[in-house]
Every structure is written in C-alpha cells, then in structure tokens.
C-alpha cells in the first residue's frame, strides 16, 4: 500500500508542477508575441472559467460512476496536451486553448482528493489531505522558482519543453495508479442536497470573500506582477527572486494563522487584518520603482494572502453539518473559481485602457471591499455569539 501512496503523490506532483513551471513568465511571454493586456487577462481567466464549469460536473460524474482513476488519467492527458500546444505554436488563439486545457486539467483535482484518502484508514483522512495539500504547494513553489532561470538559459519556450516532459511522465505513471475497491465511500451528490448547501448563508459569505481573494492573487502573483517587475528593471532570470519573496512567506503564513493569529484575534478579526494588509500592499505595487522595495512589498503581500486562504477554507465548512461537508467543499471550490476568472479578466481590461498599474489598483480596491464586508459580517457574528451566550446562561439558570 505504501508503494501506491508514493506513486499517487508523485502523480499529484506531476499534475501541478508543469502547470506552474511557466506561470511567472506566462504574461510577459504573451506580451512578446503581441498580446494586449485585455487578451492576456482573458487567457489568464480561461484557467478559472474552465474550473468553474468543469469541477462540479467532474465531481458529480465520478461519484455517480464510483470511479476516480479514469478522471485522473484524463486530467494528466489534458495537462500534457496543454504543454504540447504551447510548444508547437506561437499563435495567441492556440495559447488561449492551451491555457483553457490546463484549467480542465486542474478541475480533475477533485478526483485526486477523493481517491487519495481511500489509501488510509478513516481516522487518518486529515493526515492524507495534509500530505496531498503540501505536495500542491511544493509543486507550485518549485515550478515557479525555476521558470525565470530557464527562460534566461533556453529562451521563452524552455519552461514548456520541461513542463511537457514532466507531464508525459505523469500520464505514463497515472496508468499504474491503484484504485481500491474498499475504503471511504461517498454517496453520489444529490441536486437537492447541493441546492441546500449552496443556500447556506455562512458558505455564501465565505465564498464571496474567496472570490475576492482569488481575484487578487491571480491578477498579481499568478498574473501581472511579472509584467510590472520587468518594467522597473528586473530581468527574466531575476523573476525567481520575486517568487521566493512571495511564496516563502505565503507558506509560513499558513502555519502562523492557526497557531498564533486566530487564538489571539479570533477568526473574523484575523481575516479582516489579513485582507486589509493584502489590499494595502497590492495598492503599493504601482508606486514602487526600486527592485529592493518591490521584493519587500512581495514579502508582505505573500504573507498577508497566505493568512487568508486557510482561514476561508476553515470558515467554509465550519457551520456545515458533517455529512454535507464534502458537498460544501465541492461547491466552495467551484464558486471561488469565479475569482480566478473575473480577477485577471477585468485587471487585463483596466491595464489595456489605463496602463499596467491600473489592474493593481482594481484588485487592491477589491481587498478593501472584502475588508468592509468582514467588518459588517463580523459585527453580526459577534452579536449572534452574545445572543447565544445570553440564551445559554438563561437556560442554565
């Protein structure tokens, strides 16, 4: 069984590593091909819209068929085909198609997260999800770290050659994944149950905040940050420093939030602070002309955004009944993909109309909107908590 776990972990890594290997250089690459910011934003947003359209149907269909492996193989094939298209053409239309395929590939992640826990006993499921989540972060970090250096050595196509090679290996290895007959079974998703979960007010609030958070990160670090960095004197090989400056604090923040910030401030206050600082440091980016100061801003931006995502993930299912949490998580993941689509799409339009700085102002304001919503909702949550406390004390008396 250990061999099966290790193989699955490797395949999971090979799904994400190729997709993030070219992310820091992707927008500048399209710019060199003559892509306007509006088009670049649309290409970046296609990754999110395909996840929005495909993630829930893939989850539901795999539940109905009670198999995951075919969907995993399909995801690896889509990833490989995406990389091959990037390699074979400089056509902006085909680049859009290739990035959309990458989005379909990412949507199959739902099948990965259902199959992997079946290698574990019931009480080890959280450990399983922790392991596979770490692999995603590791793949993202390693992929993004090397892209700038690869471009300097082998040109703009270099990352796609390496990504294509790794994705071919991923397809081959995915054929040997073991899908156990026994393990944790999930009931097929019922439409009525999905509708009930989606109407849950707490989930909708958190999902809206997550849309705003994903709009910020996919318009900045996973979007136009590299373009702006190149305009203030960074070279392609130095994009690696920006990735390190952002991603290391981003990862550290995920550990910091649960152990320090939430016990100290509470969930809603911690979230308010994180969104506010993420907004401030995003709004600062267009004012920075010094490379050293730019890296400093990325450090604080990465840390602030790193606080937000685990907080939202916990809040998404906190008030959902345990038997509906899998459904809630599927719905939550599908809904926040709206942010992966809308953020880069509108940032690209603003950049085209008013220059590269405009997109940062746009998503920075989104962060302030999120902060305002949290202040309003946080007061309501505090009021409800006081009312519950009063009722309990009266009942006790």
Features from the language model and the residues they span:
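Helix-loop boundary and gating motifs at the non-cytosolic
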Residues: 2-48, 204-205, 215-232
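Helix-to-loop junctions at the C-terminal end of transmembrane segments
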Residues: 54-66, 253-266, 351
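Juxtamembrane intracellular "pre-TM" segments in multi-pass secondary transporters
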Residues: 1-2, 178-209, 393-397
